[in-house]
Amino acid sequence: DVSFSIQQGEWVAIIGHNGSGKSTLLRCINLLEKPTDGKIIDNGKNVLERGYSLPKYRTHLGMVFQSFNLFNNMNVLENCTSGQMTVLKRNKEEAKKIALENLEKVGMARFIDAKPAQLSGGQKQRVAIARALSMDPDVLLFDEPTSALDPEMVGEVLKTMKNLAHTGLTMVIVTHEMEFARAVADRVIFLDSGKIVEEGSPEEFFTNPKTDRAKQFLNTFSYESV
């Protein structure tokens, strides 16, 4: 039972305990799971209404998963071009140019011939980010992008995401990285038992939480600078 809006160019961090519904909410936004009720309004139109083009809606959304979801039989470059050619109908040269630009952004351009099995977890996630960016999404969704990584690899992925800040891209990030959320988000949504318990700016939420539930949640974390 949630209701919120996202403005163009805004970075929204969704936080909460495990099982609070964070990932389910994200999957409902891009309709990997269909909501049982309610509305999802995109540019004034309800995407859940009959007749609305879901494939067209999904082209506006990029998603970065916990477990990378790269194609193991493809190299890094192919992972970043296949969707462009299949879904966006770009030719091979155009797709390659865009993929290389985005791989450069995430520091993975020199690994274009590597297969996923040859990469570390942090490198795989950076490739996944480049792949999502290569589809030119209006909104980029991150589902706990560091949760499957070894601790020493978390920083490189967070740094990559931080470098995307203020580029005009709209981002919704489900994360347990509290200091990261505090540093880069424009707004924080605290979810508990499938409901929005508190919502506000990072400064408001992290320094002066209004609800006891949010206070209890924050007391379980110690902050380190990202």
Features from the language model and the residues they span:
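ABC family nucleotide-binding domain
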Residues: D1-P202
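C-terminal boundary and immediately downstream tail of ABC-type ATPase nucleotide-binding domains
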Residues: E203-V226
